[in-house]
Amino acid sequence: MSDVIAVIGAGQMGNGIAHVCAAAGIPVTMIDVSAEALAKAKATIEKNFDRQIKKGAIDAAARDAALSKLSTSTDLGSVSTATVVIEAATENVQLKFKIFGELDRLAGTGAILATNTSSISITEIAAKTQRPELVIGMHFMNPVPVMQLIEIIRGLATSDATLAHTVALSKALGKTPVEASDYPGFIANRVLLPMINEAVFCVMEGVGTPEAVDTVMKLGMNHPMGPLALADLIGLDTCLAILEVLHTGLGDSKYRPCPLLRKYVAAGWLGRKSGRGFYTY
């Protein structure tokens, strides 16, 4: 496969996606409006490669070869040479619609436009372009270099060729692709977020402390991480956004975001990335 990848967004997910593309030997350009965010993301990628060297997973030559495949740009026009564009911006419907309109204008005629959305309709995103058959969902899991799954979501108009190419790319990245239908939250977050939301309700109602809730789920249910620690890792703002998509899209009160989650997000307590969520970092 001779793909050239462009990743839109240099945040937690964007830099992780760029990392695995570079590690697989695929040329990748990470694009963000902020030069500062790009510098920070590149430093994170370098640090993660160094950590892999210390663990004996790769050697210095492999790291250097991977980093030679990575470039950065503040110009969205850099997507013009990409065969696959992977959007990894904030989980905001209107923002993604705007980005896909721009990508459709700037990307090459046959380029696949993929989105890392964790909950938003692929069909609706595709409708903002003139190439709906080339739009697809590639939902990576966090942290991207570690997690093996990619949810693949085809929209109503996504072609078989686009699906096949995306599945092949996922495998080339060393991931396991699993196809999900285009419903709010797909599979992963339709199952995960109600559990996280219920854990937040437990804290709000005084059923248990965050530590108690997480310990019960780790030791009692054999989860590697408790739901509240996981929410902090995902980002409480992202959790809230996904729950709102589920609640609006499926119309069931069981997806109603817990008021305490809304309060934390309003306070700027977003989890690890802000230094405080259900835990202090």
Where are these regions (language model features)?
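NAD(P)+-binding Rossmann beta1-loop-alpha1 motif at the extreme N-terminus of oxidoreductases
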Residues: 1-51, 55
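Rossmann-fold dinucleotide-binding core
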Residues: 112-182, 186-190
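Methionine-biased hydrophobic packing positions in alpha-helices, especially
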Residues: 13, 30, 138-141, 147, ...
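Rossmann-like NAD(P)-binding element
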Residues: 12, 37-40, 51-112, 120
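Amphipathic alpha-helical segments at domain termini/boundaries
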Residues: 25, 66-84, 165, 169-174, ...
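NAD(P)-dependent Rossmann-like dehydrogenase/reductase catalytic/cofactor-binding core
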Residues: 24, 161-164, 171-182, 201-205, ...
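Structural motif
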Residues: 8, 31, 73, 88, ...
